[in-house]
């Protein structure tokens, strides 16, 4: 129980630290003029959503690419095995 409690505390501390530094960096980016800071403050709540969508797209792309690579690799190995099995009795 105490181990789980300390782990959750560490996790919440880490999340809080990254969140505050993230907000600080985004506010610092829009510090130059009022228009850019207002645009950034408007889009600031949307940043986690954008990050989630881009992460999801990246993971789906990786899954598709991995599946295609595995399929091509599997087809190549299957063809090689079939050729070997087909020619071995004739030799």
From Swiss-Prot:
GO terms for cellular component: membrane. Glycans are attached at residues 23, 34. Keywords: Glycoprotein, Membrane, Transmembrane, Transmembrane helix. It is found in: Membrane. Disulfide bonds: none annotated. The chain crosses the membrane at residues 46-68. It is a single-pass membrane protein. This is Protein sigN139. It comes from Dictyostelium discoideum.
């Amino acid at each position: 129980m105490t181990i789980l409690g300390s782990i959750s505390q560490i996790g919440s501390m880490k999340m809080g630290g990254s969140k505050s530094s993230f907000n600080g960096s985004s506010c610092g980016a829009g510090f130059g003029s009022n228009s850019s800071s207002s645009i950034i403050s408007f889009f600031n709540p949307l940043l986690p959503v954008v990050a989630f969508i881009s992460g999801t797209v990246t993971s789906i792309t990786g899954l598709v690419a991995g599946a295609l690579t595995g399929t091509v690799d599997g087809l190549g190995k299957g063809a090689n095995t079939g050729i070997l099995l087909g020619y071995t009795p004739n030799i």
